């Protein structure tokens, strides 16, 4: 159990370092292609307290210095999960990689070297029987030069993920049971 806590803390620190290093984008002031690569860590809140490392990329059109519209995909790496403090876990999920595809809109509030922004991604997972993916975040963009910037953001994600859920005991006289796949709503705070 202590190893799990240590690994979780190490994963969080590595994700934070990667987010700062990888959250770069190719930028131009208006009327052209723009691409983003962001890496970060999601901290599960609510009923499902799991964490995961994620990498997303978005590509689209920068209409003006303030508005970007595009589409993207990601890789979200989730370790195995079991409902805590139960002899027979209610919900379980094996370690897996979820792949979301999404539309992305991003609004910058300034043309200066340091600019606050909001970013919204909405789509679906194409792996593990699909499910809704929505992530809204707010942050600050720090321009490195005319074509590159580093961004830091905090956000909220709402996702519908598939878990194996306790279904029923197989008889009245044994502890054998069955599980059924079920999509459940999950929430997370994202750091990118």
Across the structure, where does each feature detected by a protein language model lie?
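Solvent-exposed loop/turn segments connecting transmembrane beta-strands
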Residues: 43-52, 95-97, 123-133
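Glycine- and aromatic-enriched membrane insertion/assembly motifs of diderm outer-membrane
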Residues: 47-112
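Transmembrane beta-strands of outer-membrane beta-barrel proteins
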Residues: 34-40, 72-74, 117-121, 153-155
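Bacterial Sec-dependent N-terminal signal peptides
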Residues: 1-33
């Amino acid at each position: 159990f202590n190893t799990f806590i240590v690994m979780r803390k190490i994963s969080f620190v590595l994700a934070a370092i990667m987010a700062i290093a990888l959250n770069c984008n190719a930028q131009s002031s208006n009327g052209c292609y723009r691409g983003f690569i962001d890496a970060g860590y999601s901290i599960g809140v609510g009923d499902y307290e799991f964490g995961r490392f994620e990498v997303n990329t978005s590509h689209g059109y920068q209409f003006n210095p303030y508005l970007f519209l595009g589409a993207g995909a990601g890789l979200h790496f989730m370790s195995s999960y079991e409902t805590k403090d139960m002899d027979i876990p209610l919900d379980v999920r094996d370690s897996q990689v979820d792949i979301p595809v999404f539309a992305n809109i991003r609004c910058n509030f300034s043309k200066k070297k340091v600019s606050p922004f909001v970013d919204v991604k909405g789509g679906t997972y194409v792996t593990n029987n699909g499910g809704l993916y929505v992530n809204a975040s707010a942050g600050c963009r720090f321009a490195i030069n005319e074509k590159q910037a580093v961004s830091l953001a905090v956000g909220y994600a709402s996702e519908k993920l598939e878990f194996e859920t306790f279904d029923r005991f197989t008889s009245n006289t044994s502890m054998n049971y069955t599980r059924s796949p079920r999509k459940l709503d999950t929430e997370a705070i994202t750091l990118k």
